[in-house]
Amino acid sequence: MPTASEWTEHKIELPGRGRTFVRESRGDANAPTLFLLHGLGATGLLNWRTTFNALSEQYRVVVIDHHGHGRGVRARTPFRLVDCADDAAAVARELNLDRFVAVGYSMGGPIAQLLWQRHRDIVKGMVLCATACRFAPRGRRRLSYAVSPILNNLGRIAPRNVIRSAAR
């Protein structure tokens, strides 16, 4: 089982994008590669630390911090999932990864799907964990997500007869 000394952690420059943090196993360079993509508000280390050693017994493992997260590319504007996917592709190319399996957890799932959609030449498969097809609800759904907490709190203080009338 790999130890901490069998991992490398470094920042790499992504041409035209900025610098990002990468952690990779030093195992067999010929082993299949897993590219781990983390969830919203987390980092690669936070989401994947407990799996590094087990996965690296059979795979080469690469983990990054996404655009605007942890030590990832510094975002001057709100990050978009497509930026995260393109950053991952740029990392793969900088590391000379021919083909890899993208493993996406939570927000990493749509990133993996965008990565495959935009860079099929380097993604040979996907593993999607606790995720969705997209994370940006449209129109009324977006409004309902924003208003829902307010309505929930109003329901706690509104008189019962008002709640019953509204429910009809």
Regions found by a protein language model. Give the residues of each.
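N-terminal cap/lid segment of alpha/beta-hydrolase-fold proteins
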Residues: 1-19
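Helix-loop "lid/cap" segments that line or gate small-molecule binding pockets
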Residues: 153, 159-168
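Conserved acidic catalytic loop of the alpha/beta-hydrolase fold
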Residues: 82-99
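Residue in the alpha/beta-hydrolase core beta-strand immediately N-terminal to the catalytic nucleophile
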Residues: 65, 101, 124-127
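Conserved HGGG/HGGXW glycine-rich cap/lid loop of the alpha/beta-hydrolase fold
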Residues: 15-71
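Conserved catalytic-core motifs of eukaryotic protein kinase domains, centered on the activation segment
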Residues: 46-48, 72-78, 137-139
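Gly/Ala-rich beta-loop-alpha elbow adjacent to hydrolase catalytic centers
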Residues: 104, 108, 112
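Flexible "cap/lid" loop of the alpha/beta hydrolase fold
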Residues: 113-118, 122-155
